[in-house]
Regions:
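Conserved SAM-binding loop of SAM-dependent methyltransferases across substrates and taxa
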Residues: 85-97
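S-adenosylmethionine
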Residues: 99, 106-212
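Conserved class I S-adenosyl-L-methionine
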Residues: 75-82
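Class I SAM-dependent transferase core
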Residues: 7-73, 119-121
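Acidic active-site catalytic centers that drive phospho-/nucleotidyl reactions
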Residues: 59, 80, 105, 143
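Conserved small/polar residues in nucleotide/adenosyl-binding loops
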Residues: 214-220
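Acidic, low-complexity proline/glycine-rich segments
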Residues: 1-5
Length: 224
């Protein structure tokens, strides 16, 4: 356990994330809770704590600077679609305390776990919903709508377009750059940025695709 804790701290440093004891402890507690529930509910195929830290926690936290950037530009009310076991939103919510995180999934066992994690970690900035996103109609739109392994870009945008603010951004985590998916985006929206993500201790392709309405900015492709 101590080895995994040190790896987490080193990974956070590699990502340029300043983390105190509170943040590190909550991340470790979340990984332990995920593995405990996973024995019964099969929430993830990953069953080793070291892999959870690398492939779930650090992978999710590669998004932190981009949430900060877009949160500053367009607002901090976020929706994570197909949230599964709370990734990437739960790790992000630990650091972005001023953000309003909303997580939605159709699978009851996953939502039950996420609700327990929110209670156990005392996350005051997280709300959880168990329903289909196309049937979800909150009173206010969202500034940022994110997903991690939810669907194609076109489906992601189409299913959530009624939920996004006119100046908002869709943020989709992908493995390889999904060129064909980008080409199939519906009219009126386009890719603003394609950002190559570097996950500490992992040699794997990861990309963040930022999508917006095309009237906001000319679509650009940016690899960093």
């Amino acid at each position: 356990m101590e080895k995994n804790r040190e790896e987490l701290i080193q990974g956070l440093e590699k990502l340029g994330i300043t983390a105190g004891e509170e943040e590190v402890s909550k991340l470790i507690s979340f990984s332990e809770l995920l593995l405990k529930w996973n024995k019964v509910y099969n929430l993830t195929a990953i069953r080793d704590e070291g892999d959870v830290i690398r492939k779930h926690l650090l992978d999710s936290l590669t998004l932190l600077p981009y949430f900060k950037l877009y949160g500053t530009e367009v607002g901090c009310r976020t929706l994570d679609v197909g949230c599964g076991g709370g990734l990437p939103a739960i790790p992000l919510s630990i650091f972005l305390k001023d953000f309003d995180f909303n997580l939605i999934d159709t699978v009851n066992k996953k939502i039950t776990f996420v609700r327990q994690a929110v209670i156990q970690l005392k996350l005051q900035n997280v709300n959880v919903f168990n329903e289909r996103v196309e049937n979800f109609h909150p009173l206010k739109p969202f500034n940022l709508i994110s997903c991690r392994a939810f669907s194609s870009l076109a489906s992601f945008v189409t299913l959530t377009e009624h939920l996004i603010d006119e100046n908002g951004r869709w943020l989709a985590m992908k493995g390889k750059c999904p060129v064909e998916e980008i080409d199939q985006l519906p009219a009126g929206v386009g890719v603003e940025k394609v950002i190559e993500l570097k996950v500490p201790f992992l040699d794997t392709e990861r990309h963040l695709i930022a999508v917006s309405y095309t009237h906001l900015t000319l679509p650009t492709i940016l690899l960093v």
